[in-house]
């Protein structure tokens, strides 16, 4: 049970946050309510076109980031919170497929929210975000593995 709270609960909480973000709460209309005043505060002369570009970019970056974090949490849970003794590449693929499937269902869910639309582009951004998150995880895992190998080779050998 301790393993569940440490590894799987963060995954479930993050899924809940993604699901909540797929509702009207984080629709473009809602996010513009705080972003536009903030951008106008930063630059009172900012044009509406520039605001629209920044708003669009931040929303897409949000998709990328939320799925990078989701995939990283999922990979961590699969790697540490299960009894799977699979290769890292298999865990990578499982985490990526799970994130991709959730991205599809997330966009499907948005098709039922009046202020949202399902977007294949957003789904692809989500899937790319998951891939980026997993690549970062693999880089850290490889770095950690090479450090442990270096420490083992530096240990003095016992003389017989």
Regions found by a protein language model. Name each.
Residues 152-158:
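Short, low-complexity, charge-dense intrinsically disordered segments
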Residues 103-127:
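Interfacial helix-loop-helix junctions of multi-pass membrane proteins
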Residues 1-75:
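"…centered on the first transmembrane helix and the immediately adjacent amphipathic helix/loop
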Residues 139-152:
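Membrane-interface capping segments at transmembrane-helix boundaries
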Residues 67-82, 128-142:
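Membrane-interfacial alpha-helical segments at the cytosolic side of multi-pass membrane proteins
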Residues 13-18, 91-110:
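Small-polar-interrupted transmembrane alpha-helices in polytopic inner-membrane proteins
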Residues 3-7, 84-93, 119-120:
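Membrane-helix interface segments
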Residues 50, 54, 94-97, 101, ...:
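Alpha-helical membrane-protein architecture signal
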């Amino acid at each position: 049970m301790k393993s569940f709270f440490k590894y799987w609960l963060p995954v479930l909480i993050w899924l809940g946050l993604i699901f909540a973000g797929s509702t009207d709460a984080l629709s473009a209309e809602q996010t513009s309510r705080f972003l536009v005043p903030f951008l106008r505060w930063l630059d009172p002369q900012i044009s509406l076109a520039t605001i629209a570009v920044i708003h669009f970019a931040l929303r897409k970056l949000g998709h990328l980031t939320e799925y990078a974090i989701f995939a990283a949490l999922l990979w961590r849970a699969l790697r540490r919170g299960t009894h799977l003794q699979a290769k890292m590449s298999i865990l990578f693929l499982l985490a990526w497929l799970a994130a991709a499937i959730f991205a599809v269902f997330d966009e499907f869910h948005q098709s039922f929210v009046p202020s949202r639309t399902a977007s294949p582009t957003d789904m692809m951004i989500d899937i790319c975000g998951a891939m980026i998150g997993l690549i970062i995880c693999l880089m850290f895992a490889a770095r950690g593995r090479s450090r442990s190998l270096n420490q083992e080779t530096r240990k003095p050998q016992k003389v017989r």
